A protein has these predicted regions:
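Extreme N-terminal cap/leader segments of soluble proteins
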Residues: 1-62, 81, 90, 334
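Glycine-/charge-enriched secondary-structure boundary and capping motifs
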Residues: 2-18, 42, 95-119, 126-130, ...
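Glycine-rich anion-binding loops of enzyme active sites
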Residues: 10, 51, 84-174, 298
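Residue-level signal for inorganic ion chemistry
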Residues: 35, 74, 82, 120, ...
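Short pre-catalytic strand/loop immediately N-terminal to key active-site residues, enriched for Gly-Thr
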Residues: 61-65, 187-195, 211-212, 257-259
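Small-aliphatic-rich amphipathic alpha-helix that forms the alpha element of a beta-alpha
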Residues: 63-87, 104-115, 222-227
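Internal active-site segments that recognize and position negatively charged phosphoryl groups
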Residues: 157, 161, 194-220
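A short, charged helix-loop
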Residues: 176-196, 247
């Protein structure tokens, strides 16, 4: 089967079925451009990520997981901005036209696309080392997009879920001798390969007036620093309040903390909001009306002393400053 037949069989036909149900997509695959209709009062949110074999996923990762995760992590960016998914494009580079790979890749891709009712509206394929580039488009009300730069003094810092499990999965993939007989490896691999974009948070992030947010892709500390840098603030983090993944529970305490603080690939949301709005969210959670969130610290004014030290985060245990060393080395792209 030739390239165009493969694309039609595994991508075009499925995307056109979804497009018929997606009001924002005026024209999908089949012309020189897609046409997207954004409702009056909304703005378009756009994000792009590229995934390279050997850099962002292991060579033995199954193609279903590659397709699934490639879209999931882009959807996570939309969730962090408070945007609802509309459409996406796919640029796929393959070393050869392996139909088995393409079939499983597309099945993983559309498994999550269908879950969130997002349409594939265009893209490209070419020959070369395996890579996947996805651009997602979403919509959010004008003036309500949630940015990194909005954190305010005394905001509560929250995360949407447990941290560190996916990073442990990466470590196990590098050292496979630790997989055999490990009761936590399956949990860790599932968290690594099949992240859950937190679209369920979006309406609540608007309802409770979240001031700043981003998704945790490169490690909690490294990503929190983006909020602090953009907002010109500092933070206090209570170590005992960091939610640890169940996949870590058999590891020493220091290792658990390191994976949770620095590991990355969690794709939970880190966000800040006022104390008043945090308490309202918690009240609704207790009555079953809102998702669970975890309070991990607070935003502080950036003092000259912290600027000179180049350190925007202070750790506390039971409210007292921590004197012992805590690793702060999150993932770096270069």
């Amino acid at each position: 089967m030739g390239e165009f037949e493969l694309i039609r069989k595994y991508f075009t036909l499925h995307s056109n079925e979804v497009n018929l149900e997606q009001n924002c997509v005026q024209l999908g695959i089949g012309d020189d451009c897609a046409l997207i209709n954004i409702p009056h009062g909304d703005v378009l949110a756009v994000s792009t990520d590229t995934f390279l074999e050997g850099t962002h996923f292991f060579k033995d990762t199954n193609p279903f997981a590659i397709g699934f995760k490639s879209l999931a992590v882009n959807l996570s960016d939309l969730a962090a901005m408070g945007a609802e998914p509309v459409a996406f494009t796919l640029a796929l580079t393959l070393p050869d036209s392996n139909e088995d790979f393409i079939a499983e890749f597309s099945r993983g891709l559309f498994t999550i696309a269908d879950r969130f009712r997002i349409s594939l509206v265009g893209g490209d394929t070419t020959r070369g080392p395996l890579s996947v580039t996805i651009t997602v488009m979403g919509k959010t009300p004008c003036n309500e997009a949630i940015r990194r730069s909005g954190a305010r003094d005394n905001d509560v810092i929250c995360v949407s879920g447990a941290l560190g499990g996916a990073a442990y999965g990466v470590a196990l993939r590098y050292d496979k001798s630790k997989i055999h007989g490990n009761p936590d490896s399956a949990k860790a691999f599932n968290l690594l390969d099949y992240p859950n974009p937190r679209m369920d948070l979006v309406p609540f992030m608007h309802k409770y007036r979240v001031n700043s947010a981003l998704d945790i892709s490169d490690g909690f500390l490294g990503d929190l620093k983006h909020i602090l840098d953009s907002s010109e603030k500092s933070a206090e983090i209570e170590i005992k309040d960091i939610p640890l993944s169940e996949a870590l529970h058999n590891l020493p305490a220091d290792e658990q903390l390191n994976y949770a603080l620095n590991g990355g690939d969690d794709y939970e949301i880190c966000f800040t909001l006022s104390e008043k709005d945090y308490l309202l969210w918690q009240d609704d959670y207790k009555s079953g009306k809102a998702p669970k969130i975890y309070r991990v610290g607070s935003i502080k004014e950036l003092s000259d002393n912290r600027i000179s030290k180049g350190n925007r985060v202070t750790f506390t245990e039971n409210g007292k400053a921590v004197s012992r060393h805590i690793d702060r080395n999150s993932f770096s792209h270069f």
